[in-house]
Amino acid sequence: MKKQWIAGAFGLTAALAGLVSVPQSALAWPSFAAGYEEARESSGKIVCANCHLAVKPTEIEVPQSVLPGKVFDLKIHVPYDTKIQQVGADGSPAPMQIGAYIQLPEGFTVADEKEWSAEAKESIEKYGGVTPLYADKPERSNILIINQIDGSTVPGQEFIVPVKPPDPNAKDAKVNFGKYGVYVGANRGRGQVYSNGVASNTAQYNAPVAGTISAVQTGVTFTDKLQYGLGTEATDFEYTNGTRVTITDEKGKASIVNIPPGPKLLDTVKQGAQIKAGQPLTNDPNVGGYGQEERDIVLQDPQRVTWLVAFLAAAFICQLLLVLKKKQVEKVQEFEAQKQGL
């Protein structure tokens, strides 16, 4: 069943997955989700949605059933318009980045390289492979991430992950045969909110109060405290060539809105203009978005499959014998009818 979550409904104070990092070469990191004890909440929402506020499709492909130890390919398609560029950390256009969060059933692992299909090997050579989200917790090695990468380097905008199912018949097995869920979240572009709730330069900026725009300054330098993942310390980041809008309310109190480079001021935002609380000051520069999908996969018992095949074969033989017997009876009846001159 397809589930895509609109992050705004869940607030803006959670840690981000895939949000901007200071270096231009590190535009977004799904690894920020590691700050959560559970990156996939009980509601089914993956925490990446907390900071990627736009909804975009994510498509996954897995087989309906698999056998123990039989490697299969998990395919994750992250579609986007290749003509569009995202807003970089300095406000300039930058290549669209894509990344993914993958939660396999417990016991399912990434296959060894010698077991990869040719298609999976070619894909991994392009995007670099998966990384455990909780590197310090081997028991949670089924939760993986694909860190942000330039989407133009990923053929077909598709990640392929070779997965090996466990064998419940193994001596130390902790899993059973049955149905399990595979959960995937994928984003394209940077997030709109940092871990501490501060908006990034891919967010739309609104007026915090109603009043009169008393000043509009361009080319402004200012500093914001940005937190790059839950549990990390917020650090100062200096924006240059930003915009500062001052709004004075009816009591004469001034509110200042510092806008980093990236969002563009609307034509209506001019000195002396009247504005309402919540009214947009800028356009929405975000061209990316996040989506998540889940699929059921059945870990089949080979013995059960064998018995099923045997049962179907026996049923087929029985039906065949019945057909042959019926034809035999019909021939006997036809012969007796001819003998009696009927």
From Swiss-Prot:
Q: Which cofactor does it need?
A: heme
| TM regions (residue ranges) | 305-325
Keywords (A to Z) from UniProt: Cell inner membrane, Cell membrane, Electron transport, Heme, Iron, Membrane, Metal-binding, Photosynthesis, Signal, Transmembrane, Transmembrane helix, Transport
Among the record's GO biological process terms, what is one? photosynthesis
- A GO CC term assigned to this protein in UniProt: plasma membrane
**Subcellular location(s) of the protein:** Cell inner membrane
One family name in Pfam for this protein: Apocytochr_F_C
Keyword check for Glycoprotein? no
Q: SUPFAM superfamilies from the entry?
A: Cytochrome f subunit of the cytochrome b6f complex, transmembrane anchor, Cytochrome f, large domain, Rudiment single hybrid motif
Q: List the disulfide bonds.
A: none
Membrane topology designation: Single-pass membrane protein
Which positions are annotated as binding heme?
C48, C51, H52
Molecular function in Gene Ontology: electron transfer activity; heme binding; iron ion binding
Cofactor detail note:
Binds 1 heme group covalently.
Signal sequence residues: 1-28
Functional summary from the UniProt entry: Component of the cytochrome b6-f complex, which mediates electron transfer between photosystem II (PSII) and photosystem I (PSI), cyclic electron flow around PSI, and state transitions.
Q: Its family?
A: Belongs to the cytochrome f family.
- Self-association state and partner proteins as the record states: The 4 large subunits of the cytochrome b6-f complex are cytochrome b6, subunit IV (17 kDa polypeptide, PetD), cytochrome f and the Rieske protein, while the 4 small subunits are PetG, PetL, PetM and PetN. The complex functions as a dimer.
What name does this protein carry? Cytochrome f
Q: Which organism is it from?
A: Gloeobacter violaceus (strain ATCC 29082 / PCC 7421)
Point out the gene that encodes the protein. petA
